[in-house]
A protein has these predicted regions:
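Cytosolic regulatory regions of ion transport systems
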Residues: 1-179
């Protein structure tokens, strides 16, 4: 009866959504009514909307965006993809992303295979580390890079480790400010 009815369909995990093909499950005339989504993608959109990566440098014609992204699971990957989609900032420079994860090199290769344009849309530096292995000197190197960090997103599934990393980050910023 309802000719305008649409169906939104959750497909998890993100790796399955990437390869999912609606046409394998529905007739062609039904395809316009079906939309698939993923929870990690919704979270990433909301995070970047509420906590824009360029907030500290939004009015600058020179400064560029530099994110620290801890965790390249579904949410981390979705943040990176959303950043690539939106990453056109006032300075005209492509955003730099320092990605920290224990298996980041393989995960990054898989992302680039799935989304080849990523290489041209973001500048990525990978750090093959578990979140618990990150040291003060690592944080200092990222914070005080030639492109200073503008935002950090900590996205591992271990909330205690996430909070410890956040505390380390804040402590290093405060230590530098007091020098």
């Amino acid at each position: 009866n309802n000719k305008d009815l649409e169906c939104k369909c959750l497909i998890e995990p993100l790796s399955v959504k990437r390869i999912f093909r609606l046409q394998d499950y529905f007739e062609n005339h039904s395809l316009p009514r079906i939309r698939i989504f993923n929870e990690a993608e919704l979270i990433a959109r909301r995070i970047l909307q509420n906590y824009p990566p360029d907030l500290p440098v939004a009015l600058s014609d020179e400064a560029s965006v530099h994110l620290v992204l801890v965790g390249l699971g579904s949410v981390g990957q979705s943040i990176l993809l959303q950043l690539a989609r939106l990453g056109h900032y006032r300075s005209g420079k492509k955003p730099k992303v320092t990605i920290i994860d224990r298996n980041v090199k393989q995960q990054w290769r898989e992302m680039v295979e799935a989304y080849p344009p990523l290489m041209t849309l973001v500048q990525v530096e990978t750090q093959e580390l578990r979140i618990e292995e990150v040291s003060e000197s690592d944080v200092d190197r990222w914070l005080f890079d030639e492109k200073p960090v503008t935002m950090a997103y900590v996205c591992t599934k271990d909330e205690i480790a996430n909070l410890r990393f956040a505390r380390l980050l804040v402590n290093r910023i405060q230590a530098r400010d007091s020098d």
